[in-house]
Regions:
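Catalytic cores of RNA-modifying enzymes
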Residues: 1-123, 162
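Conserved Class I S-adenosyl-L-methionine
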Residues: 127-129, 134-167
Length: 167
């Protein structure tokens, strides 16, 4: 494949596990292993780049954009990226035919997110059925709020995680 792009000195194509590479990049393109999609999105959230085009399982792409019934990954992804759906890819377009459909999405970087913030948001979501008062108590903080995570916006959840980190 490199021989097809030898005229492009600013293009570096890497074949292999890019997650173990320490190269800087401005654009990331990948047909991700579906079992690594969440890991890949969290990894990309920590990197400085302009945009990524990735193919993921359709169900996962729906989780990323979900504003109802928040998931930790949707809160993080929407905080760090502008997400655009480019196209659906039917399972019948592959051989052998997989069990699921796919979606190609564009992730435009809004901000780099620290590993600590990602970890804290994930920990907060491990208490998702508790009230905010009880969640914050787990981290040694006080609150009188009886709201649950599902009642908060993604930005409010990020602010709670940032408050936990600062404490």
């Amino acid at each position: 494949m490199k021989s097809n792009f030898h005229d492009y000195s600013n293009l570096v194509l890497e074949y292999g596990d890019g997650f173990n590479s320490d190269h800087n990049f401005s654009i990331f393109v990948s047909n991700l292993p579906y079992s690594k999609s969440r890991f890949a999105v969290e990894w990309l959230l920590q990197k400085k780049f302009s945009r990524a085009v990735i193919m993921v399982q359709k169900e996962f792409s729906e989780k990323l954009s979900s504003n109802e019934k928040h998931k930790a990954i949707s809160v993080l992804a929407n905080y760090g990226f502008r997400i655009k759906f480019l196209m659906n890819v039917k399972k019948s377009n592959f051989f052998p035919i997989p069990k699921v459909d796919s979606t190609v999405i564009l992730l435009e970087k809004k901000k780099v997110i620290s590993k600590v913030l990602i970890s804290t948001v994930n920990r907060v979501f491990s208490y998702r059925r508790k009230t905010l008062q009880n969640i914050l108590k787990q981290f040694g903080l006080n609150s009188t709020s009886k709201k649950r995570l599902d009642e908060l916006s993604g930005d409010e959840i990020i602010k709670i995680a940032q408050k936990i980190i600062r404490s």
